[in-house]
Amino acid sequence: MNHNIIVIDLEATCWEYDRIPPGQKTDIIEIGICELNKSTKAISNKQSIYVIPERSKISAFCTELTGITPKLIKEKGIRFEEACEKIRDEYHPEMLTWAGFGAFDREQMMQQCDYLGIENPFSGNYLNIMHLFRNHNGLYKMMGLRRALNALNMNFEGHHHSGADDAYNAARILREIL
């Protein structure tokens, strides 16, 4: 029995005031990913997988928010299908629970897989860490990643809106509430 949970955080093309330009759609541009071992509580295999957007361009607003530039994507980006294959090869996620902080990551992954007609590399078993945190702490309202860390007396490690760093910090929260 595998004791790992895959934790992801996606960064996607975005625009100021959520105004999507005509003819463009939100595309995943980074898959931040790591593994949490439920038994040992160790977090490992943290990485960023940069993805070439197929239906949109990276806006200046998106670069300012995420630090992801068109140049970075040109140098390190791979096609979404290749990113999914890399995840399958390195994490073997099809039988593991996967998690993210909120519903966006699950929904965007499913939408992009559906659009491209490829199989989602992850299992059907998804944990919404934001909901788990709220329920674990008996909170009425949801809170963001930074506030959840603060509530646990933990500092954010890395850069906010870096997929790998956000996934790692989400895994730290999950580790505390499991």
Which positions does each model-derived feature cover?
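A generic structural signal for short coil/turn motifs at secondary-structure boundaries
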Residues: 17-19, 74, 135, 158
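Metal-dependent phosphoesterase signature
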Residues: 63-86
